[in-house]
Structures are given as C-alpha cells and as structure tokens.
C-alpha cells in the first residue's frame, strides 16, 4: 500500500496540486510526553537498541527498524521521534518506543503527541535563476552562495522555510500539517517558473 504523497503511486489531484507536483515527505519530527520520570542509565543497559552518553547528550538515543526512526528519550519523560516519512508512521513509532519503555518497567503513558515539523522535498525539473529571485523577493530571501549553495526563502503564509537550489530541487521545512507543505509549494511554484533559467 503506497503512502499518500509518494510520487508515481497515484495520479495527482490537480485541484489540490495545480502545479502537478506533490512534495514528498522526507522526515517527520514529533514529540510525546511519557508522563513519568525515567532512569536513562537503566534504559540504556536493558534496551538492545539504545545508546546513552550523558557527557555528550542528556538523552537516550534509541532506534527501531519499522518504522525506521530514532527517538531521543529524556529523564523527564519527554520524547522526540524523528525519521518517519508520514504522520501516521511517526505516531506508530512513538507508540512503539513508549511500549519498549513500559516493558522495561516504567509506568509510561502517551500524552500530548504532537507533530512538530514536517520536511518535504520535490524537484521542479528546471533550473532556477537564484540571483534574480533573491533580488526581486529580497524581503523573504537570503542567498549567499559562498556560504550555502541554496536560496533560503522564508514564507510568511504559511510559515514555511524553503531551500531552493539552482538545479530545481526544493526542500520545505517548518510545517505542522502536510497541507502547509503543499500550500507553500503551490505558492512558490509560479515564482520559480518566472525565474526559470533558459538553457543555452
């Protein structure tokens, strides 16, 4: 069963995606409160897939294969889950981590699950004149090619940060719901078309 939003899985709904391009979700960051204090040392010693180096970072780093994700688990009971490719997978992964903690003997709950950031990407399949774009959209753009090869575009509505590369590859970050990713891309697409590089 293909995830919604994966390229080539189904025809694009042009009423939602007039550009004909649907950004692919690459990473979901979510948080949840296990609502109990945790002994990180005990977790690291008992769990197979966990590492804990308190001198470097004050959390247990735990990984599972399915959905392929990484969790940061803090002594306060707060947990961050990264790496899932959809909202449902992020929640499923977070539940699996909570279950692992429960099996180790902690009274872990599953409170206030929240998607914090959605990262998407796509390819408009044409090169873009970043200098021109940066110049005409100066209020939203920062472009310093000697520091970073992409143009950073801070969209106000929805509040999304886009990384725009000369190749036509786009990364969109900062969404809390996937619709914001899609809206931001549809907003920027006409601008990208306007600054399309004409191939000699």
Curated annotation (Swiss-Prot):
Similarity annotation: Belongs to the TBP family.
Main location: nucleus
SUPFAM superfamilies per UniProt: TATA-box binding protein-like
Assembly with partners or alone: Belongs to the TFIID complex together with the TBP-associated factors (TAFs). Binds DNA as monomer.
Pfam annotation, one family: TBP
Entries under Gene3D superfamilies matching the protein: TATA-Binding Protein
Localization of this protein: Nucleus
Gene Ontology molecular function terms on file: DNA binding; RNA polymerase II general transcription initiation factor activity
Transcription recorded as keyword: yes
Protein name per UniProt: TATA-box-binding protein 2
Keyword terms, alphabetized: DNA-binding, Nucleus, Repeat, Transcription
GO terms, biological process: DNA-templated transcription initiation
CDD domains, alphabetized: TBP_eukaryotes
PANTHER family on file: TATA-BOX BINDING PROTEIN
Keyword Zinc part of the UniProt annotation: no
InterPro entries (UniProt xref): TBP, TBP_CS, TBP_dom_sf, TBP_eukaryotic
Functional description taken from the UniProt entry: General transcription factor that functions at the core of the DNA-binding multiprotein factor TFIID. Binding of TFIID to the TATA box is the initial transcriptional step of the pre-initiation complex (PIC), playing a role in the activation of eukaryotic genes transcribed by RNA polymerase II.
PROSITE patterns: TFIID
GO cellular component: nucleus
Sequence repeats: 25-101, 115-192
């Amino acid at each position: 069963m293909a995830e919604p939003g994966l390229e080539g899985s189904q025809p694009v709904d042009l009423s939602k995606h007039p550009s004909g391009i649907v950004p692919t979700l690459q990473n979901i960051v979510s948080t949840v409160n296990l609502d109990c204090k945790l002994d990180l040392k005990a977790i690291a010693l008992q769990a197979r897939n966990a590492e804990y180096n308190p001198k470097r970072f004050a959390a247990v780093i735990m990984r599972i294969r399915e959905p392929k994700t990484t969790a940061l688990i803090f002594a306060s009971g707060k947990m961050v889950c990264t790496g899932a490719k959809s909202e449902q997978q992020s929640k499923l992964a977070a539940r699996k981590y909570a279950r692992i903690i429960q099996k180790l003997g902690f009274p872990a709950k599953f409170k206030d699950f929240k998607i914090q950031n959605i990262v998407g990407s796509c390819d408009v399949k044409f090169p873009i004149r970043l200098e021109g774009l940066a110049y005409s959209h100066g209020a939203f753009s920062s472009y310093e090619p000697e520091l970073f090869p992409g143009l950073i575009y801070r969209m106000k509505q929805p509040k999304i940060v886009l990384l725009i590369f000369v190749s036509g590859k786009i990364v969109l970050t900062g969404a809390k719901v996937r619709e914001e990713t899609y809206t931001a891309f549809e907003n920027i697409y006409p601008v990208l078309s306007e600054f399309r590089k004409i191939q000699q």
